[in-house]
């Protein structure tokens, strides 16, 4: 009989990242389901500005998994990754003739869930 051991999930959350959710989703869609080591390589080689905060978040989640739960980083993969819209920071830019122009700076919240690859073991009956 084959018994599947229950995987452990490690969750990391970054809030109020100063970029639009659409730009962060472009990167997150590329790494969803990849292994931890493959994810780091993808994020280092992609030319987008959103890669750096996502790289830091994935690295932090793996460090939490190894330190707090004692998991090996080589066994981790990204089981869930999502980007939600955050608050919109509103500023006013002065314009000519005493007018002002609104500047809207979007933010986003990024959630990364790392899981351990399931191990299959043979159980004696």
Swiss-Prot record:
One GO MF term attached to the UniProt entry: rRNA binding
InterPro entries: Ribosomal_uL22, Ribosomal_uL22_bac/chlpt-type, Ribosomal_uL22_bac/org-type, Ribosomal_uL22_sf
Locations listed in the record: Plastid, Chloroplast
GO aspect biological process, one term: translation
Keywords per UniProt: Chloroplast, Plastid, Ribonucleoprotein, Ribosomal protein, RNA-binding, rRNA-binding
Pfam families for the chain: Ribosomal_L22
Entry's Gene Ontology cellular component terms: chloroplast; large ribosomal subunit
Family statement: Belongs to the universal ribosomal protein uL22 family.
Function field: This protein binds specifically to 23S rRNA.
Subunit field text: Part of the 50S ribosomal subunit.
Protein name as it appears in the record: Large ribosomal subunit protein uL22c
Protein source organism: Nuphar advena (Common spatterdock)
């Amino acid at each position: 009989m084959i018994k599947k051991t229950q995987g452990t999930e490690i969750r990391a959350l970054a809030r109020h990242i100063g970029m639009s959710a659409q730009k962060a989703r472009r990167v997150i869609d590329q790494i969803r389901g990849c292994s931890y080591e493959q994810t780091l390589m993808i994020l280092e080689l992609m030319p987008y500005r959103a890669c750096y905060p996502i790289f830091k978040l994935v690295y932090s989640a793996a460090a939490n998994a190894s330190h707090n739960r004692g998991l090996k980083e080589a066994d981790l993969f990204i089981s869930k990754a999502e980007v939600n819209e955050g608050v919109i920071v509103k500023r006013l830019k002065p314009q000519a003739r005493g007018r002002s122009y609104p500047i809207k700076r979007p933010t986003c919240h990024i959630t990364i869930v790392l899981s351990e690859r399931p191990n299959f073991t043979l159980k004696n009956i």
